[in-house]
Amino acid sequence: MHSLPVMVLFGLSFPPIFFVLLVSLTLFFICIRLLHSSGIYEWVWHPALFNTSLFCCLFYLLFHLGV
């Protein structure tokens, strides 16, 4: 992951971690929609902490898998 170059789009430079962030945000919103529709989200004691930990876990996994 550290060998990826900086991406330049329309004159703006983005670090490689920015694209991992976008992918993890997309997966996060998909997971939240699935959890809401399946009813599992009703069993969550503290939704804000659950959302934060879910996003952190997704971001960590994607960063270390090298997506």
UniProtKB/Swiss-Prot annotation:
Domain of life where this protein originates: Bacteria
SS bonds (residue pairs): none
One of the Pfam families matching this protein, by short name: DUF1656
Record's keyword annotation contains Nucleotidyltransferase: no
Subcellular location: Cell membrane
Alphabetized UniProt keyword annotations: Cell membrane, Membrane, Transmembrane, Transmembrane helix
Family: Belongs to the AaeX family.
Name of the protein this chain belongs to: Protein AaeX
Gene coding for it: aaeX
